[in-house]
């Protein structure tokens, strides 16, 4: 459902009383940053149950909007697993936006953990095409987040048999994050969406949003920040693009299984390429080319990320395969994307400064 009416919340770290005042004001107030986010936007998807599907990618889903190549879409997203963990971590319900409560209260099928905006139908997109998603703008819908671990979860399941949660306060003016109950730590805010993907082939059915795959999905790649572009292969007509799983910050690996889960807004620009093909996703930042490897085996994920960069250098830069392989050995930086989603991720980053 598309509408031009939005909630916007100014942010404060001045305590519960201030948070209550700002939550009330959020019904009509608009921050300068979100005003910028609305500029040159073709479609807007405010946070609502109608614009969310919870925890899956599926080619049989009805799209919430149809766009053309070159259109921009503004959207608002609820953090993974909804509001319950925020409550358990000590965030007052008075700080929740009415739209957040509305989404949580609606009866809906929850296959996985991530409320995803969409799907977005892209006119003209066909199987074998490439979808380019430009991350134009990413910001905070609320100035708090949560992180923690489940019993026996994450990278060290035997070390931490219990569970723990921590709330985080986000200073949206200065771009810093503090961990409640822990003094002397300040984390740089680096918001990004952990899950961006298209529908899998119709015969594949419904895919849980937890693990990434050929449809992309839950990459949890902390380098896909504002200003980055993601390229994905299309598997069904219209592509059926979905996005969600907002993170305020994350380390390489996401070792507990969660980043700082946060509610974000974003603006994307979608470009359809009929003259390109891809087997696996790629990305590009202003400074780097990014290849990706996804596999339950970390070694195989690393091989895939390397192989995909070699393929990029051969196909896009015109290099001989052997030379491309050598260049990867001396200049490609492999990073662990995440270790905790079943299908592990490794991404390779190659500096654009190498090319004159």
Predicted regions located by residue number:
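Alpha/propeptide regions of enzymes that mature by internal proteolysis
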Residues: 41-42, 46-52, 60-74, 79, ...
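Short, basic/aromatic beta-hairpin or loop at an interaction surface
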Residues: 39-53, 94-111, 198-210
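Bacterial N-terminal signal peptides
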Residues: 19-31
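Boundary at the C-terminal end of the N-terminal hydrophobic targeting segment
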Residues: 32-37
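N-terminal secretory signal peptides that target proteins for export/translocation
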Residues: 1-17
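Conserved mixed alpha/beta catalytic, RNA-binding, or beta-rich assembly cores of soluble enzyme
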Residues: 193, 202-213, 222, 228-296
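Intrinsically disordered, low-complexity linker/loop segments enriched in Gly/Pro
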Residues: 114-115, 137-224
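Short, Lys/Arg- and Gly-enriched loop/turn segments at beta-strand edges
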Residues: 80-92, 138-148, 238-248, 338-339
């Amino acid at each position: 459902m598309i509408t031009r009416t939005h909630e916007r919340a100014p942010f404060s770290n001045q305590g519960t009383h201030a948070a209550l005042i700002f939550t009330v004001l959020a019904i009509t107030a608009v921050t300068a940053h979100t005003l910028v986010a609305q500029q040159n936007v073709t479609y807007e998807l405010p946070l609502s149950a109608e614009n969310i599907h919870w925890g899956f990618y599926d080619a049989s889903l009805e799209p919430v909007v149809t766009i053309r190549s070159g259109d921009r879409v503004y959207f608002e997203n609820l953090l993974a697993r909804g509001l319950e963990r925020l409550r358990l971590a000590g965030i007052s319900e008075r700080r929740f936006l009415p739209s957040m409560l509305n989404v949580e209260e609606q009866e809906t099928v929850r296959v996985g953990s991530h409320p995803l905006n969409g799907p977005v139908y892209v006119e003209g997109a066909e199987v074998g095409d490439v979808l380019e998603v430009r991350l134009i703008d990413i910001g905070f819908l609320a100035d708090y987040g949560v992180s923690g671990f489940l019993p026996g979860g994450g990278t060290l399941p035997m070390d931490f048999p219990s569970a723990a949660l921590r709330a985080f306060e986000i200073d949206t003016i200065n771009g810093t994050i503090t961990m409640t109950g822990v003094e002397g730590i300040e984390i740089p805010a680096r918001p990004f969406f952990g899950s961006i993907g298209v529908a899998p082939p119709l015969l594949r059915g419904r895919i849980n949003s937890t693990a990434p795959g050929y449809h992309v999905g839950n990459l949890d790649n902390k380098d896909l920040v504002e200003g980055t572009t993601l390229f994905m292969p299309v598997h069904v007509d219209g592509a059926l693009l979905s996005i969600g799983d907002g993170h305020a910050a994350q380390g390489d690996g996401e070792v507990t299984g969660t980043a700082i889960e946060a509610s974000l807004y974003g603006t994307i620009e979608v470009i359809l390429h009929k003259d390109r093909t891809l087997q696996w996703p790629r990305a590009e930042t202003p400074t780097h080319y990014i290849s990706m490897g996804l596999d339950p085996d970390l070694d195989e994920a690393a091989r895939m990320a390397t192989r995909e960069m070699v393929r990029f250098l051969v196909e896009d830069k015109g290099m001989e395969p052997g030379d491309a392989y050598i260049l990867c050995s001396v200049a490609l930086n492999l990073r662990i994307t995440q270790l905790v989603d079943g299908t592990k991720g490794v991404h390779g980053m190659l500096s654009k400064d190498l090319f004159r």
